[in-house]
C-alpha cells in the first residue's frame, strides 16, 4: 500500500517535471527565432544593445527616454534574448500603473507573433480579482477556499497546458471552471511563468513581497525591469514607513473589554504611553526613544495572536466583525514592529496630529535607498527606466 502511494506520488510529480523540461526547450527555441517587430527608430538599437550588455554583465542601468520612444519593447526584447542565452530564467516587469501592465502584456503578445514562446502572468491585487463581495480568505466566508488545495493542481495543469498568456480574464475563467481562488491561482501560476508583470510591492514591500522567489536562500536567476522608476523613491518611503494612531488603541479596547481582559489591559498600556507622548507634542515632536512603547507593542502583538488562535472562524463566542477588526489591527502593529527593526540613521521617528485631530506616531523612512538596493540584489540585473529620471544622482 505504501509502495503504491509512493509510486503514484512520483508519477504525479514526473508529469510536472516532464512538462517543465519540454516547455523550457520550446521557450528557448522560440526566443532564438524571435525578431524585433519593427524597424529600429533612431537610437532604439543602441538602447536595446545597452540593456543587453547591462544584463550580460549583471549590472544596473538607469534609462531616461521620452514617452513614445518604445522603452517597453526596448527593454523586454533584450531581456528575453538574455533568457534565451541562459543568462537568466525569469523576467519580472514591475510597474505602479494598470495601464503600463497592459502595455507590457501587449508587448509580449506582439513578440509571440515574432516567434516568441513565453508563459506570462499579470498579478492582480487580491481585492480586485476576488470573486466574493468581501475579501475574507477562509473556508467559512469563501466557497472557493473550501477544498482549494484539493483542486488547484488540476486547475494549474489544465491552464498551463492550454495557454501561454495568463491574463486576469483567463485566470478568472479557469478559476471558475475548477472552483479555486483566482488570486492564489495567479500566485501559483507565477512559478510556471517566464515573465511576471506586477506592482512594485511584489518585490519591494517588506510584507507582501513574493517569498517564493525573494526569500533568503531562493535562487536569484531573475531580471528586473522597473517601469516609471521615478515613482519608486516615494513608493519606497511609503512601504518602509509605518504609522500607528492612538485613537485606534482606544477604539479596539472598548470592543474587546467584555471578551478578553488581558488584551484590554495591553491596549490600555500602549494607549497610556502614547498619551504621554501626546502631552508633550504641540504640532509635531521628534521621538528619540520609544523602546518602552515597542516593548508594550510586542506584548500586545503576542496577545492578539493568542486571541486570533482562540477565536477562529468557527468560534461563535466572538463575532466575525470583531475578529476581523482585531486581525486588521494586528497587521498594523506587525507592520510597525517590522519597520522598527529596520530603523537606522535614514529614519526619523516623530509624533504629530492628523488633520482630523487624531494623535499619531510615525516611523518615517527619509531615504529608502538601502532597502530598495537590498531588494534589487535579489535579481541578477535591474533596468530602471522612465521619461523623467533627472537629476540622475538623486535616483542612484
Give the location of each predicted region.
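Pre-Walker A (Motif I) flank of P-loop NTPase domains
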Residues: 56-61, 89, 380-381
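Walker A/P-loop NTP-binding motif
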Residues: 52-53, 72-87, 107-111
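Structural recognition of the conserved hydrophobic beta-strand(s) that form the central parallel beta-sheet
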Residues: 92-94, 196-199, 223-226, 381-386
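SF2 helicase catalytic motif II
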Residues: 196, 201-203, 218-251
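Walker A/P-loop
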Residues: 56-78
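A substrate-engagement module of RecA-like helicase motors
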Residues: 2-12, 16-35, 87-196, 201-204, ...
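Conserved pre-motif I regulatory segment
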Residues: 19-64
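A contiguous, basic/glycine-rich beta-loop/short-helix subdomain that forms a polymer-engagement track
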Residues: 171-196, 207-215, 307-396
Amino acid at each position: 500500500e505504501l509502495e503504491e502511494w509512493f509510486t503514484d506520488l512520483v508519477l504525479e510529480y514526473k508529469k510536472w517535471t516532464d512538462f517543465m523540461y519540454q516547455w523550457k526547450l520550446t521557450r528557448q527555441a522560440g526566443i532564438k527565432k524571435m525578431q524585433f517587430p519593427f524597424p529600429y527608430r533612431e537610437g532604439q538599437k543602441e538602447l536595446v544593445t545597452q540593456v543587453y550588455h547591462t544584463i550580460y554583465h549583471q549590472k544596473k542601468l538607469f534609462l531616461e527616454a521620452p514617452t513614445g520612444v518604445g522603452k517597453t519593447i526596448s527593454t523586454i526584447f533584450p531581456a528575453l534574448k538574455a533568457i534565451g542565452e541562459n543568462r537568466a530564467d525569469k523576467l519580472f516587469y514591475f510597474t505602479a500603473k494598470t495601464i503600463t501592465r497592459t502595455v507590457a502584456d501587449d508587448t509580449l503578445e506582439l513578440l509571440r507573433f515574432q516567434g516568441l514562446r513565453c508563459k506570462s502572468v499579470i498579478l492582480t491585487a487580491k481585492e480586485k480579482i476576488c470573486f466574493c463581495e468581501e475579501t475574507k480568505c477562509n473556508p467559512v466566508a469563501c466557497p472557493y477556499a473550501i477544498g482549494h488545495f484539493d483542486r488547484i493542481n488540476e486547475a494549474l495543469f489544465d491552464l498551463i497546458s492550454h495557454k501561454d498568456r495568463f491574463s486576469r480574464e483567463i485566470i478568472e475563467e479557469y478559476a471558475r471552471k475548477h472552483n479555486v481562488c483566482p488570486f492564489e491561482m495567479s500566485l501559483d501560476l507565477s512559478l510556471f511563468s517566464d515573465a511576471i508583470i506586477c506592482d512594485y510591492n511584489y518585490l519591494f514591500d517588506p510584507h507582501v513581497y513574493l517569498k517564493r522567489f525573494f526569500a533568503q536562500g531562493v535562487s536569484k536567476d531573475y531580471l528586473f525591469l522597473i517601469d516609471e522608476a521615478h515613482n519608486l523613491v516615494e513608493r519606497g518611503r511609503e512601504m518602509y514607513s509605518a504609522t500607528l494612531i492612538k485613537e485606534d488603541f482606544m477604539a479596539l479596547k472598548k470592543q474587546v473589554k467584555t471578551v478578553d481582559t488581558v488584551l484590554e489591559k495591553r491596549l490600555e498600556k500602549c494607549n497610556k504611553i502614547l498619551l504621554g507622548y501626546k502631552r508633550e507634542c504641540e504640532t509635531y515632536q521628534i521621538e528619540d526613544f520609544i523602546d518602552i512603547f515597542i516593548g508594550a507593542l510586542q506584548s500586545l502583538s503576542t496577545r492578539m495572536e493568542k486571541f486570533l488562535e482562540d477565536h477562529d472562524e468557527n468560534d461563535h463566542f466572538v463575532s466575525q466583525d470583531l475578529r476581523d477588526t482585531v486581525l486588521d489591527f494586528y497587521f498594523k502593529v506587525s507592520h510597525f514592529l517590522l519597520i522598527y527593526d529596520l530603523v537606522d540613521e535614514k529614519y526619523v521617528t516623530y509624533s504629530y496630529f492628523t488633520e482630523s485631530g487624531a494623535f499619531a506616531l510615525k516611523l518615517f523612512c527619509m531615504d529608502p535607498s538601502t532597502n530598495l538596493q537590498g531588494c534589487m540584489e535579489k535579481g541578477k540585473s535591474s533596468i530602471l527606466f522612465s521619461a523623467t529620471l533627472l537629476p540622475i544622482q538623486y535616483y542612484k
